[in-house]
A protein has these predicted regions:
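Conserved acetyl-CoA-binding loop-helix of GNAT-fold acetyltransferases
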Residues: 86, 92-105, 109, 128-132
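Conserved beta-strand-loop-alpha-helix junction that forms the acyl-donor binding cleft
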Residues: 117-127, 144-147
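Acyl-donor-binding surface of acyltransferase catalytic domains
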Residues: 1-29, 144-145
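A conserved beta-strand-loop-helix scaffold within acyl/acetyltransferase catalytic domains
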Residues: 46-87
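Short acidic/polar active-site loop segments enriched in Thr and Asp
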Residues: 77, 113, 136
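Conserved acetyl-CoA-binding loop of GNAT-fold acetyltransferases
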Residues: 131-140
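Conserved GNAT acetyl-CoA-binding A-motif
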Residues: 107-118
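Helix-loop element at the rim of GNAT/NAT acetyltransferase active sites that forms part
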Residues: 24-26, 34-43
């Protein structure tokens, strides 16, 4: 698992296009559906709902359709992004980059100065995305799952 971090200033130089990214809490039904499509279980969504402090879902709209979803929460000066899912038909169009920028703007509005995200080593596309938007690996961990 890679843990990426960057200053919110790195990602707040250009706002996402109008009516493309929405910070919403509680999450809309379409967001929960997109999380489910991406393998994010109800149990994980329930963990997001229990988070204390500032939190938001981010709904991405692209080509006039729901395109992706993510979750962000702030603790102190750190914002953490989780559960980023982009619909397969909307990938390779910059949606995830804009979603991360929206997360950074939202985080800055909450007083955060850092944006962080964890990503499995196996997720080549997401690792490339986070590097391409200026995030740096600041740590990592390995875990085993019984199965």
């Amino acid at each position: 698992m890679n843990i990426y971090s960057t200053s919110v200033d790195t990602l707040t130089t250009e706002r996402p296009p109008k009516v493309s990214m929405f910070s919403v809490w509680p999450p809309l039904a379409i967001e929960i559906d997109m999380w489910a499509e991406g393998g994010i279980s109800d149990a994980r969504v329930n963990v997001m709902k229990r988070v204390q402090g500032p939190k938001t879902s981010i709904l991405a709209r692209w080509n006039d359709h729901p395109a992706g979803v993510g979750f962000a929460a702030v603790h102190g000066k750190n914002a953490f992004v989780h559960a980023v899912e982009i619909r397969s038909t909307q990938r390779q169009q910059g949606v995830a980059s804009w979603l991360m920028k929206q997360a950074a703007f939202w985080a800055a509005e909450q007083g955060a100065s850092r944006l962080n995200v964890a990503c499995t080593n196996a997720n080549v596309a997401a690792n490339a995305l986070y590097r391409s938007i200026g995030m740096k690996v600041v740590g990592g961990y390995h875990y085993r799952m019984k199965g």
